[in-house]
Amino acid sequence: MASPVEASPGCASGLGPHRRKRTTFSVGQLVELERVFAARPYPDISTREHLAQVTHLPEAKIQVWFQNRRAKRIKDRKPGALNSRLELPPNSCSLPDTPQLPWDPGTSSHPLHPTSSAQYTSACPPQTSCLGPILGPGQSWSGAKVAAPWGTSGASGIHSSLEQIVPQTSLGNLSDLIYTSAIVTNVDHF
């Protein structure tokens, strides 16, 4: 009788390639990573360790995320790069200019929960639908208010989650959206 390892081809027996499990980042983790990346594309070890505590990710995964994000930025900046997402939806709303990040990592004891969702404060009237435009590199909204996923004090008209704005079909598209729409503030604490 064959053992379970022998019976399953490619599983630890050397018969096939071993595929590493792909890391799936939560919206909250991506918001935090993108925010720091916008200020420091080459974070030092203390910044990466702080991000590891805040996002509940291993420091090594954070380091790899930054390497991949820098490569993506270089790829997106190449002339002639195909970018079909430059058009704004006709009924999309503009977001206010003032960033709102109520969380201060230097004073707060509320870490980012890995399953949190980012929330955006919208300037749209409550009865209308805000379609989040997907913009290419070099384009931006008139501004964006980002409420930290772990607190929404002082925010009004908040979408219940980022999933209402952007479908969760591709981490690449979500990462592009966060990168192009996030406003960097309060990064001097690093």
From Swiss-Prot:
Gene Ontology cellular component terms for the protein in this record: nucleus
Domain of life: Eukaryota
Main location: nucleus
GO terms under biological process: embryo development ending in birth or egg hatching; oogenesis
Gene3D superfamilies: Homeodomain-like
Signal sequence bounds: none
Keyword Transcription (UniProt): yes
PROSITE patterns to which the protein is assigned, alphabetical: HOMEOBOX_1, HOMEOBOX_2
DNA-binding feature ranges: 18-77
UniProt GO MF annotations: DNA binding
InterPro entries cross-referenced by the UniProt entry: HD, Homeodomain-like_sf, SEBOX
Tissue spec. comment: Expressed in brain, skin, ovary and liver. Also expressed in maturing oocytes, eggs, zygotes and 2-cell embryos, but not 4-cell embryos.
Subcellular location: Nucleus
Region (Disordered): 1-20, 76-123
SMART domains: HOX
Keyword terms, alphabetized: Developmental protein, Differentiation, DNA-binding, Homeobox, Nucleus, Transcription, Transcription regulation
Family that this chain belongs to: Belongs to the paired homeobox family.
Annotated protein name in UniProt: Homeobox protein SEBOX
Organism in which the protein naturally occurs: Mus musculus (Mouse)
